Amino acid sequence: MKHRSGRAWMRVAAAVALSASAACGDLATAPAPDGDRLAGVDVSHWQGAIDWNRAAGDGVSFAFIKATEGGDYVDPAFAANWAGAAAAGIPRGAYHFYRPQTDAAAQAQHFLRTVQLRAGDLPPVLDVEVTDGRPAAEIAAGVRTWLQTVERATGRRPIVYTRASFWTGQMGGGFGAYPLWVAHYGAAQPSIPADWSRWAFWQHSDAGRVAGITGDVDLNWFAGSWADLQAFIQTGAFSHAP
């Protein structure tokens, strides 16, 4: 995901054709070729104050919310967004922006101190998209430390957010057991890093428009139905093939 922005997904009941408005990321017209996907948003303080009830009414079925970055940064809007999404009945997840220059275990503890997960929340997310000038092997080792630390502490297997072009050049293998949230804009289907055979979430636009959110917001798909999403939240199991 872009360092400045959040992520979004919306629920669409049936497949629709790609149009000019869809290309711009309108929520109601974003293409869902198989009609069996959920749409949602992911956000940070860059989206400003959000009317989560309006967003829910516009079809937001889940939201990823920026919580932390590095070893000490907390997104200024995290608390408001975390509470607002829950109050509007939107399944929520928190993400950490990984900084390879900072100790991975310290980053994991910072996230765990900041985010209190409860029943009905999405799994934690690690956003992996920058190198900070660190070597690939060091980045991969640190990412593994963060994922394992957070999974042990929460009992939830984290989601990995990345894009294929970054992951392929930096990370190597051995991460395919973690659910994938992949970023790829302007494509009928996203490119997927070699570690994975399918995606759970797909960020397909960074220029979406959603009621209750001022300006652009990232749009995302979940590769399944509402029942699939609830099963994923409850068990961590993901069996729907996009």
Question: Residues of each region from the PLM?
Answer:
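Bacterial N-terminal signal peptides that target proteins for export
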Residues: 2-13
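N-terminal Sec signal peptide cleavage junction
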Residues: 23-24
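Sec/Tat-exported extracytoplasmic proteins
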Residues: 59, 67, 86-89, 115-119, ...
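Aromatic-lined carbohydrate-recognition surfaces of secreted/lumenal glycan-active proteins
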Residues: 155-168
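Structural detector of well-ordered beta-strand residues that form the stable sheet scaffold
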Residues: 93-95, 125, 159-161, 181, ...
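Glycine-rich, charge-decorated loop segments at or immediately adjacent to ligand/cofactor-binding or catalytic sites
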Residues: 103-104, 166-176
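Substrate-binding cleft of extracellular glycoside hydrolase catalytic domains
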Residues: 36-53, 65-156
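Functionally critical loop-and-helix segments that line ligand-binding/catalytic clefts
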Residues: 30-44, 48, 53, 175-242
